[in-house]
Amino acid sequence: MNSIKFNIIVIFILFSIINSTPAKEKVDNYSVYAKLPLLGEVEVQKIETELSIVDSTFEYSYYVAPTKIVDFFDKKITSGYILGSLENNSVNTDQYYLKTEKDDFSRIIEFSYINNVIHDVSVNPTYDTSKITNVSEIMITESVDPVTMFFKITNFEFINGCNKTIKVYDGKRRYDLKLSNPKITDESYICTLTHQKIAGYKPEKIKENKIYVSDLKFLVDENRSYKFSEVSLRNNNTDLIIKKN
């Protein structure tokens, strides 16, 4: 009787192993360069991301640290993740977590999503929003978080042929990234990326309505697939170029 029970247990374990789906994991590294007067491009940050997929669910973690090559650039360390599912070349985020740390200060930002829509927002400690334009509830619910945005623009299957607008909310600011005008060659696929401030900025910045235009670039790899190469974004009046290592 004990032998029969043992055999049943062994068969059950083997069946579970055979039918379990192994996680697919990928780690990517990026360098962030700032365009500085007189100095040109200077590496100011390192980014590491890790993607783990089981069936259609995923976890995507994100870590940013300064290089300390220049003393005056942002010295914050940022870490976080998103959880969600991947379906039909689309990213459906369920949870977002981000922590920023600098010296003895830290801030945690969390979003929970329902049906791929931001439902709850927690920012601790809160930002001082007394001098910036209001971000409405509708503006928030139509958006995604910055890590989801980065995951999308660095993976070719999620850019929808360079014909989409990614609406982003980071817990304070609301902005649009519009992808358009694909330029296709034998070796590359380049989208025009238009960055526009929507809300959560000083009123004069919104009134100025200054639009930043750059390129989102993918290169053809040895398997003839498009892989992210680089993108230029605007942050605090500084041009930042993110390049895949």
Go through each PLM region and give its residues.
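Bacterial N-terminal signal peptides that target proteins for export
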Residues: 1-8
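Intrinsic disorder/low-complexity signature
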Residues: 4, 16, 140-142, 152, ...
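Hydrophobic, well-structured mid-protein blocks that either form specific transmembrane helices
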Residues: 106-148
